From Swiss-Prot:
One of its GO terms (biological process) is siRNA processing. Residues 368-537 form the Helicase C-terminal domain. Dicer-like endonuclease involved in cleaving double-stranded RNA in the RNA interference (RNAi) pathway. Produces 21 to 25 bp dsRNAs (siRNAs) which target the selective destruction of homologous RNAs leading to sequence-specific suppression of gene expression, called post-transcriptional gene silencing (PTGS). Part of a broad host defense response against viral infection and transposons. Its cofactor is Mg(2+); Mn(2+). Gene3D superfamilies: Dicer dimerisation domain (3.30.160.380), P-loop containing nucleotide triphosphate hydrolases (3.40.50.300), Ribonuclease III domain (1.10.1520.10). The gene is dcl2. This is Dicer-like protein 2. CDD domains: DEXHc_dicer, RIBOc, SF2_C_dicer. It comes from Aspergillus fumigatus (strain ATCC MYA-4609 / CBS 101355 / FGSC A1100 / Af293). A motif (DEAH box) lies at residues 144-147.
Amino acid sequence: MASTVSTCQDASPYQPRNYQLEMLEASMKENIIVAMDTGSGKTHIAVLRIKAELDICSPDKVVWFLAPTVALCIQQHEVIASNLPAVRTRTLTGLDKVELWTDQSIWDAVLNGYRVIVSTHAVLADALSHGFVKMSQLALLIFDEAHHCTRRHAANKIMQDFYHPTLTKSGPAAVPRIMGLTASPVVRSNHQELLMVESNLDAVCRTPRLHRQELLKFTHRPHLQQIWYTPTDPAGFRSASLTLGALYHAWENLDIGDDPYIQRLRKSPLDDRALKKALLTGKTYCREQLRRFVDRSRHIFEELGEWAAEYYIYASIKQLRDRVRDSYMSGDWDEAEKAYLVDFLSKIPTSDIHFALNDPDGFRISPKFESLLNFLDSSDQREFSGLIFVKQRVTVSAMTSLLSVHPYTRERFRCAAYVGWSNSSASKDILGDLLNMQLQRDTLDDFRSGRKNLIIATDVLEEGIDLSACSVVVCYDKPPNLKSFIQRRGRARRKQSTFAIMFPTDDTSADVSRWQDLEQAMIEAYQDDERQLQSVSALESLDEEVMERLTGDSTSAVLTADMAMAHLHHFCAVLPPQPYVDMRPVFSFETNEDGLLKGTVILPSCVHPKVRRTEGRRWWRTERAAMKETAFQAYKSLYEFGLVNDHLLPLTKKPELKTHDLGSMPSILETSEQYDPWIEWAYSWSSPDIHQSRIVVKMNEGRGDELCMRLIGPEYLPPLSPMTLFWNSSTTFTVTFKAAERVPLVPLSSVEDMRAITALYLKATSSRVCSAERDFMALFAPDLHHTELKGWLDTYEGSDPAMEVYSRGHNPLLMGVVRDHSRYGEPFLFRKWLVSHQNPSCSIVELECAPFPHRRNFLRRQTLANSQVDVDEAIPDSAAKNPIVAAEACTIDRLPFTMAIFGLFISAIVEQLEIELIATRLRDTILRDVSFKSTDHIITAISTPLAHRLTNYQRYEFLGDSILKFSVSCQLFFQHPNWHEGYLSEGRDMIVQNPRLAKAALDTGLDAYIVTKRLASRKWSAPLISEKLGRVPAKRQMSTKVLADVVEALIGAAYVDGGHSTAQACIRRFLPEINLHAVDTRTAARSVAPESARHMMNDRLKDHIGYTFEDESLLVEALTHPSCDYDSTTQSYQRLEYLGDAVLDMVIVSAIFNHRIQRPQGDMTKIKHAVVNANLLAFLCMEFAISEEKLDVAQTSKDSFAVTSSQESVELWRFMRYRGQGLKAARDASLARHRALRDEIASSLLQAPHYPWHALSRLNADKFFSDIIESVLGAIFVDSGGNLAPCEVFVEQIGLMAYLRRILDHGIDVRHPRSVVQQLAKTNIQFVLQRVPTEEGGASYQCSVQMEQAELFVVTGCLTAEEAEVTAAVEAIKFLTRDEGSTPLNKS
């Protein structure tokens, strides 16, 4: 049946090589036949060619890959599909019964949507013959084993009957391009066949001409060995084998008249002619079956010996009897013929076959097989992998059985048989074919994996089939022609391998050199450089002087051609390292008509395309000189492009990336004292410009009366934000401030009244002895005209004896603060009078009071709800809890407590005014160009946690950090299109590092505005003019981190205040070199980039991304892995991934920060790290797919077929452009883990209350999966002109935003298991990681958990250190919560 896209887990190791790229370039220019040794990578050249063709051809055209056998079709399809996962591919072979597809609609359905078809030659030839497929549908035809394209072969039929006539009639545009692949360009010994193959395929034969030495380096020619044996006497079987002799005797004496077919013909007079013919020829079905069976038995005897022949006869007779009993297996056989064959063979005496003999002499073998055993015994058994070619299928099965049971081989070799996939249903043999086709399905995979180490096969394994490199290949019979010799020898391509041919001692044509000489003669017809090898070696010994010199513009640094190679290799060595990528420069050469050479060098794909490829300027006689000159020109280009400094060294970790010299900045710095705004006010009071703001105090959101006051200052009063003051659990006060207004012509006496009133309020709520100084900085007064203040003061200043107040019958609701002078004037709140009459003439008056609140910081909610008394006297309380004081010892303030309570709020108001003055000053000076709308965000940004204010900078710093990283990343990306990702990353790190930001804070004077003083509410005293005048500023210690944090917090505050534009202005204030507004984001990124190559892309998948690219080359770049070296016009995705990383941070952090539930900075950081975790992004990348309809053909009856429909997923990762089997193997391994863990991870993301740390650590996806997400984000950002909105759409499309919302809305626990363990443990817990080497050369990881120097347990066998640590942490959580019944973190 047809195979569709699949993976080949054990594809042969492969690394990109120069000669493969050379062959690719040649195939793009003309039709060629790639002639290279077996194992040198021809199929991978074809894969590159297919990829290139699909990028440029019309999407309705097909690439058709042709192979001579079904097995080879299946193998090549696996290679193509696994290396081009984005391409829909399929096979069409006889296994699909294509010969029965007689309807055009069937063919249309089969080909619909597929871009690559792999089939045998006959399938395409027949389809073309019947018009089901037209030559115009084909973009590229690839002929594997192209030497078959001769004479009447179906390959030649395709060319002669369809290609050439179409070419003649309509021209080259009407026919597909041609590529042939072969390791043996001639089949027989006639070298003229090379020209015939070229003509038939309309192609020229090419072998790598410029890198022959590299080709030989990777192609290991085996040691050729002859194995001699004494041939068996053909007539000796009669006496040597009783069973075979009896079989032969019975066959010789077989009476044709007893044949059921003859007897049937004799009974019918109409069949007289057929009867005569049968009697004359002696051919009937039964006689032919027996004849072939006897011949095969004799052949096995001669090849393998008596035991094998008797085994074959015994097994064949048993198989026949089993088939006769099985009506399904016997099919259409004639019952009489079945009975006749069974009866004939039943008379043959058969020996008992013993499979478990320990005596080698019990296995009577032929001299030829004995020679084979001796050879195998002498072979190196370490990592043995062998292949034995035999002539006949029956020999395959018999030899496999014999090797599997013989004492010399059964313990040493794991044998398997292989005869290919020819349609066995077409064979009419019911006797003697012992091979079970189903048992060989896994043979090749078992051999590649090492489960089998010796295959016995027919010539079906000569051509194309991808096998692991063999250490031993044996031809049990001489190769029939040159093609077989070359192909079989090519199987032995392991280093120090052996290719053996068995010869009888009486063979006169056993000279192995005959094949070698003939092969060399054929190859020379198309390989000129082989004949010139000696002269080239002589030329390379010449010493050519390369006179080139480069001097740094501002230094005395010099580069000569002799130094250029070392410098260029060093430049490549310090590029950002990438797995699966060879970072070395690649040199190639071209030759002119004079035989001179010119070099070309290609640098790794992370280097900008403009300087990635450099050609030499002169022609040279030697490769060595050409390389020197080319390396010099390349390094000169790097210098001129700005990637090398004036010292002629790479920029990485050099001063060129530093914007400021920070030296070694200490972690603790001496900085300015906190700015004190009262000093300016102190001087302003000498000639005040009185401003006042009306204050309104409401209790419980306005329920009840208002208290109105005024705040007075000597100069402009900044707007103050409303304040909420928490009296107790049920009572709050809201303090609002009206806009300040100037009050002209306030006499000095009125100012003094204000000072007295301010002192009165401060004293009314204090038990301390107040200072006589009244030169307060901020003044407070009731909401009256200044002319009325004197009268108000006369009314409420002072106190009266309690007895006097009692006697006046004063309104309890207007009672002032009670002061018990027996307790040194301790204040109380009046509750009620208590009067006791001991006698008629004497009454004792007492006061039941409530304790005066000790709390002074009303800005924070109180922690104990019952710790305060209520203000409202109507609230009942138990008298037993209230102190009773004697009226005679008390006085009561004239100022009612309902007014005096304002004195408790003055400290908070003054502190709020102070911080507002600091923020206003900062806004109007350092931040004057930032255009903050409000100082509220500035206040938050400059308040350190140490100040213990209601808000601090931590949340804004979290936001500002990402905004700064985003802005700097954008600026460097757009400003330096010549910089690779390494320079960009280091340049960004230089700018956003704490020392650089701390220096910016010091340079601008920001350090003075950072609030670190803590409000001491209990010891607070109102600031006085006399204290501030003449005060000398001091210094304070501050950490570098705090300085940097405040800069980032101000950036975050600016973003909250006015969006990105305000944030960019703030960044520019502290980092003048960052000016993103000055960068044209729409044109800067592509300003020096050449046009990228085309790249096939699924249109529906592009729609699924949620963004339509104006410049699709950006999407191509976003999908180009650094290993993709075949496209020198497109840079790898590393730059876009660098930018996308910052874009993703910006999108995620904004969503976290702006969520309705405000979280502390620590929680936001944990959420961010969980959401942008590389394994989560990789999982979403693997999941990001569309579903497409896939049509296929199913057989509904014997001759009927129907089109079936199914759905298949097309994932984004399939479109990543790469090269290299290492990356492919890693990709497939990650996808296998994804398939195993998908349900668990997906379920966790949708339902679990915890983040799936454990499952994601086991996923251990390669980084390129998450890189693709970030690089596509970067591409969208660039193409949209720096617009974050379409980036947010893509993040939504991949499912990341949905999971982030779930985390934020439902409080998903994102703590890392290790953090959970540390929180659960009452003592320090240590995780000790260890790398454990494995026998296969790899490594696993283990992690032990230790508590108080005792080891709790060890987790072993983990793929990575992260998995080991997370698994250990999960187990530790179980251990620590084993008695609680549930764990705080599931293993999800």
